[in-house]
Regions:
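Transmembrane helix-loop junctions in multipass membrane proteins, especially transporters and channels
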Residues: 39-43, 70, 96-100, 130, ...
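Short helix-perturbing small/polar motifs within transmembrane alpha-helices
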Residues: 17-20, 24-32, 37-40, 96-142, ...
Length: 229
């Protein structure tokens, strides 16, 4: 009797791992790619190529949520968070060459902001999606991604670029001082701190991808459901 229960438990565990593995791999790939592509600037520095890969993390979360429920989606989120922390630790040890000085590829405040924003925004996405899952097929992924993306942008830019955050050292605050340089808003408007333009551009890309991602969500969610059933 006990042996049968153990065997059944192991079988369920193996099945759950098989279900989660594609989501974990996809999330890890997105996080790693985004951490690499964030080093490459475009549009006069308003965006990086990472801005176009990172939002697809919400697609992965929503697909896992639709197919296997919020508990499985949260496990994928935590896996992505761990991968992100590892990437940040590696990035903090890579020194880049500036004009007569060296600096870490990933500043401390940016690393902390990235991790917190990812974890909170993704978990909020999971909760909103689950609450709205019984409506029209597009409502849950669209609403959860829009709200999660807005929260992600708000948290990241607040923690990363607020002029001074008490629990960070003076050196950590100085590392992001460039974000307060006055620049034309979005390169053509009135002068504003650079981080404001970065935040607006980042948010705009996320909103666009939230709409675009409805297409692969529809297609992939149906395929996954066919496999599950």
């Amino acid at each position: 009797m006990v042996g049968g229960q153990v065997s059944e438990h192991l079988e369920k565990t193996d099945t759950n791992m098989q279900r989660l593995l594609p989501g974990v791999i996809a999330m890890a790939a997105i996080v790693v790619a985004s951490n690499i592509l964030v080093q490459f600037l475009i549009l006069d520095g308003l965006l990086t190529w990472g801005a176009f890969t990172y939002p697809f993390a919400f697609l992965v979360t929503d697909l896992m949520n639709r197919a296997y429920g919020p508990q499985s989606a949260r496990k994928v989120v935590f896996a992505g968070f761990i991968v992100g922390v590892i990437c940040s630790l590696i990035g903090s040890q890579i020194m880049m060459q500036g004009d007569g000085y060296e600096y870490a590829a990933v500043a401390l405040r940016i690393a902390v902001a990235s991790g917190i924003a990812f974890l909170v925004a993704q978990l909020v996405d999971v909760a909103i999606f689950d609450r709205m899952r019984s409506g029209a097929w597009w409502r849950a992924p669209l609403a959860s991604t829009i709200i999660g993306s807005a929260l992600d942008t708000t948290l990241f830019f607040t923690i990363a670029f607020a002029q001074s955050v008490p629990f960070f050292s003076e050196n950590a605050n100085m590392e992001i001082s460039w974000a307060w340089d006055a620049m034309p808003l979005l390169t053509f408007g009135p002068d504003a701190p650079l981080w404001v333009s970065l935040a607006i551009a980042d948010w705009a890309v996320k909103m666009a991808i939230a709409l675009i991602a409805l297409v692969p969500f529809r297609v992939l969610s149906e395929k996954i459901q066919n496999v599950v059933t």
